Design a protein with these regions (language model features):
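C-terminal trimerization/auto-chaperone modules of long, extracellular attachment fibers and adhesins
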Residues: 487-490
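Bacterial Sec-dependent N-terminal signal peptides
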Residues: 1-22, 468
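C-terminal tail/sorting-segment detector
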Residues: 2-3, 496-507
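Residue-level detector of functionally pivotal "anchor" positions at catalytic/ligand-binding pockets or at interdomain
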Residues: 457-484
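Short strand-turn-strand beta-turns centered on an Asx-Gly dipeptide
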Residues: 345, 423, 484, 500-501
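A sequence-level/structural motif corresponding to short, flexible coil/turn segments enriched
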Residues: 18-464
Length: 507
C-alpha cells in the first residue's frame, strides 16, 4: 500500500484588521462612576452614528451643554466624519436597551425606567412616562426621532402580575428593534403581563410548583416579537416563545433573538424542557435522573420550524446565548456562546466554562450547514467565562468581538476577536479590538467602549489582510481530526495535522 505524508496547517491567527478613521470620547459620568456597560449604539445607511449611555454630569457636545447633574441617559449623534451633531438628555432613572434606524434615517430608541421619566428631543413635545416601581427599572418605553432629533412618538409599557399567587417581581424590557419596510418589529422580554394596546396584551406564563402544603407560582422568561406601524400604532403579535402550560418545573427559555427579511420573521432561541412557539410545542426530554436535553428552536415564522437537540446533561446552561442573527443570501447566520456541547453541533465541546460559536443554517429548510467554535481556554471554569459583546456580519466574513469575563467583578480583562468565513473557517485575529458595543453599515464600523468615558472609534469596514492566513492541502479518502479528536469536517481548530498512511499525528 502506498504511503504518503500530508501536512495541513490551520491558521493560528488571522492578520485581518480594520483601518481606523477617527476616534473621540464623551464625558458623561462623574469621576468614580461607571457608565452603563450595556448601552447600545446605531449607525444609519449614511454613516451617521448614534451613541447612547448613562449620565450623571452635563454633557458638552456640539457646542452646547446638555442636561444637568441629575442621573439620566443620553443620545449623541456624530456624522460619518466624526463631527458632533447634537445630544439629547433623557431625564430619570433610565437604561437604554435597544436602538436602530430605518431607511429614511429615522431613529428608534428603547429603554427601561423606574418611577417617572421624561423623554425629549432636540425639538418636539417632551413626553412624561411613569412606572409605579420607584426603585426598579421594571417598565419600558420606545421613542421615534427624526434624523434631526425631533421627537415624533413615544410609547411606554408596564408589566403586571399574571396571578395573585406569584410573589416574584415582574418586569418588561425591549431587547431589540428592527425597522423593515413600513414596519417596526420589537422584541419584548417579560415576566408579567404587558398591555401593548387595548386590543393586544402579552400574557406571561409561569410554572406551578406543588410544595404539598401550597402551590408556588414561579415567573419565567417570555419573549414576543410585535410589529407596529412606524408611529407605534396597529400592533400585531408575530411570534411568542414561552414555557408550555403545565410545563416541567425545569423548563426555561435561555436566550431569544430574531431578524426580518422582507415580510419574513426569523426566530432563533435556546432553551430546555417544555416550550411553545406560538401554538407549536417543542419538548426537550427529561431522563428522570435530573438530566435534560437543551437545544435550539429555529423558525421562519408561519412557514417552518425546527428543533435542534443537544445531548442530555444535568447542568444549567447559563452561558448558552444567541447574541445576534442575520439572514442573507438564503442563509441564517447565528452567533453566540455555549457551555458543554454546542446545540448546533453536538461534537463541539466547550473548553472551559463557555466558548464562542457561529453557525450557518439554511433559511428555508432550517437545517444546519456548519457550526464552528473558538475552543479558547479562558481559565478556571468557576472564575472566567466568555461573552460576545458584538457581531459584525461583513461582506466576506463574520467578526465576533469576544471578551473573557471575570465572574467575581464582571470585568473583562481579556478581549479576543474572531473572523469566520461564510464557508465556516474560524481564525483568531492577531490584534484584538476591545468593544462593549459595535455598529456598522456597508462602509464603516464603529466601536464603542464604556468606562467613566464613552470612547468612540470609527473604522473602515473593509478588512485589510497583510499576510497569509492559512495553508491547506487536501488528500482524498482521508479523515482528518483536530487536536481534541474531532473531525476537521466539523470544526477547524488551530493545529498541525500530519497524516502518514492510516495514522494521524496532531501537533
Amino acid at each position: 500500500m502506498r504511503k504518503f505524508l500530508l501536512l495541513i496547517a490551520v491558521a493560528l491567527f488571522s492578520t485581518a484588521t480594520y483601518a481606523q478613521l477617527w476616534s473621540t470620547s464623551i464625558s458623561a459620568v462623574a469621576e468614580g462612576d461607571k457608565a452603563s456597560q450595556n448601552s447600545p449604539a446605531a449607525m444609519d445607511k449614511d454613516g451617521n452614528l448614534y451613541v447612547t449611555g448613562t449620565k450623571t454630569l452635563p454633557i458638552e457636545f456640539a457646542g452646547n451643554e446638555v442636561g444637568g447633574e441629575d442621573a439620566g441617559a443620553y443620545i449623541a449623534k456624530y456624522n460619518a466624519e466624526g463631527v458632533e451633531q447634537y445630544a439629547i438628555e433623557l431625564i430619570g432613572s433610565i437604561d437604554i436597551t435597544a436602538i436602530t434606524t430605518d431607511a429614511e434615517n429615522n431613529l428608534y430608541v428603547a429603554g427601561s425606567f423606574a418611577g417617572g421619566a421624561m423623554i425629549q428631543g432636540v425639538t418636539g413635545e417632551p413626553k412624561t412616562i411613569s412606572n409605579e416601581e420607584l426603585d426598579s427599572k421594571t417598565a419600558t418605553f420606545i421613542a421615534k426621532y427624526s434624523a434631526e432629533g425631533e421627537l415624533l412618538a413615544v410609547k411606554s409599557y408596564v408589566a403586571t402580575l399574571p396571578s395573585l399567587d406569584i410573589w416574584d417581581p415582574v418586569q418588561v424590557s425591549i431587547a431589540k428593534i428592527v425597522a423593515e419596510g413600513s414596519k417596526v418589529y420589537v422584541e419584548f422580554d417579560y415576566t408579567g403581563n404587558v398591555a401593548v394596546e387595548e386590543n393586544l396584551s402579552l400574557s406571561a406564563k409561569y410554572i406551578s410548583i406543588d410544595w404539598g402544603f401550597m402551590i408556588y407560582c414561579m415567573v419565567t422568561n417570555n419573549a414576543s416579537v410585535v410589529s407596529f406601524d412606524s408611529d407605534f400604532t396597529n400592533p400585531t403579535e408575530i411570534a411568542t416563545l414561552a414555557v408550555a402550560d403545565n410545563a416541567d418545573q425545569c423548563s426555561k427559555l435561555f436566550s431569544f433573538n430574531f431578524d426580518v427579511e422582507g415580510e419574513n420573521v426569523y426566530v432563533a432561541a435556546l432553551g430546555r424542557g417544555n416550550l411553545v412557539l406560538n401554538s407549536e410545542a417543542f419538548d426537550f426530554a427529561f431522563d428522570g435522573q435530573g438530566s435534560t436535553e437543551k437545544g435550539a428552536i429555529l423558525s421562519k415564522v408561519g412557514v417552518k420550524s425546527a428543533k435542534i437537540s443537544n445531548i442530555s446533561n444535568g447542568n444549567d446552561a447559563e452561558f448558552n446565548t444567541i447574541s445576534d442573527i442575520e439572514v442573507r443570501d438564503g442563509k441564517l447566520y447565528i452567533a453566540g456562546t455555549f457551555n458543554e456541547t454546542c446545540a448546533f453541533d453536538n461534537e463541539i465541546v466547550a473548553v472551559g466554562a463557555s466558548d464562542v460559536f457561529v453557525a450557518s443554517v439554511d433559511a428555508n429548510e432550517l437545517t444546519v450547514d456548519w457550526a464552528v467554535a473558538n475552543a479558547n481556554d479562558e481559565g478556571e471554569t468557576n472564575k472566567y467565562y466568555e461573552a460576545v459583546s458584538a457581531v459584525v456580519f461583513g461582506n466576506e466574513s463574520v467578526t465576533v468581538f469576544d471578551a473573557v469575563v471575570d465572574m467575581n467583578n464582571n470585568e473583562a480583562p481579556v478581549a479576543k476577536n474572531y473572523t469566520v468565513s461564510y464557508e465556516g473557517v474560524i481564525a483568531e485575529t492577531e490584534e484584538a479590538i476591545a468593544a462593549t458595543a459595535v455598529v456598522y453599515n456597508a462602509n464603516n464600523i464603529a466601536v464603542i467602549n464604556y468606562t467613566n468615558e464613552t470612547v468612540v472609534t470609527m473604522y473602515d469596514s473593509a478588512l485589510t489582510t497583510t499576510a497569509i492566513e492559512s495553508v491547506v492541502a487536501e488528500a482524498e479518502n482521508n479523515v482528518i481530526y483536530d487536536i481534541t479528536g474531532r473531525r476537521v469536517e466539523k470544526i477547524t481548530n488551530a493545529g498541525i495535522y500530519i497524516v502518514n498512511g492510516n495514522k494521524v499525528l496532531v501537533k
